[in-house]
Amino acid sequence: MNNIVKVTRLFDLLERLQVNYPKEDILAGKVQGVWRKYSSREYVEISHDYAYGFLEYGLQQQDKVITVMNNRPEWNFVDMGTALAGMVHVPVYSTLSEDDYRYIIPHSDAKIIIIGSALLYKHLAPVIASLKNPPAVFTVDPVEGANNLDQIVTIGRDNKEKWASVIEENKKNITPDTLLTIIYTSGATGTPKGVMHAHSSIVFNFLAHAAQQCKNSSHRYLSFLPLCLIYERTMNYEFQSLGISIYYAENMGTIARDLKDIQADGFCAVPRVIEMMYKKLEDAG
């Protein structure tokens, strides 16, 4: 493709999608059993709304935002919104112990924690409440008594004129060496450790692998490995860089159904997942 938009910072992917891969289903997730698809244009606009909203809420450059959620389009909106605003996304596994969360949240110095579901909120709320300086809490799904992430989107849209020029300046001034994310280990081998990654670290990896990718913008992938896992996260960006549609599985138990439903051209997996699939096929005869 001629005139492909160059990517050196994560948020450059948004311009590439809008210019080179304007499609109607770049991201999709299940909402009440129905696929909710997001176009390239929507992805760009919503990500900017998140950036405006974070700034209007009072966050500043290099402030940390934690997410604890399963794979869904909203993960990407937060991811790109924080990148555009010059903040640091800290995605955390949704399966950690209370002690791990009790360590990671203050250690990361997060100003906001975004929780995906009511079930996760129920698990995390007591932990957060026990902290000396707890971050503000928002949920993606509606949860009684909790702030909803839509509030951030709304104040972002309402204050676009106030913050649009700030974001445009960020696009000029944020360099590939700017801190983008902190990725914590799963804690399986001891206390979770936070690994700091600049834009360049992440971008180099997904562009290098994308050069070997045989699929293109006519294809769609199913995503189910946690996006806080660097492998899945890297592939998530790689697919976006090539305009490949990404559909997020409802949960680990719906993989087979979702693969069939969207007629997926592929997915990323680890040996354990392949072993589970093989056993199911074997048991089915």
Spans of features found by a protein language model:
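Conserved structural elements of the adenylate-forming
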Residues: 44-49, 176, 195-216
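A short helix-loop-beta submotif of the ANL/AMP-binding
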Residues: 64, 70-90, 94-98, 106-112, ...
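Conserved AMP-binding/adenylation subdomain of ANL enzymes
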Residues: 203-220, 227-285
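A short N-terminal helical cap/helix-turn-helix that marks the beginning
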Residues: 5-27, 45
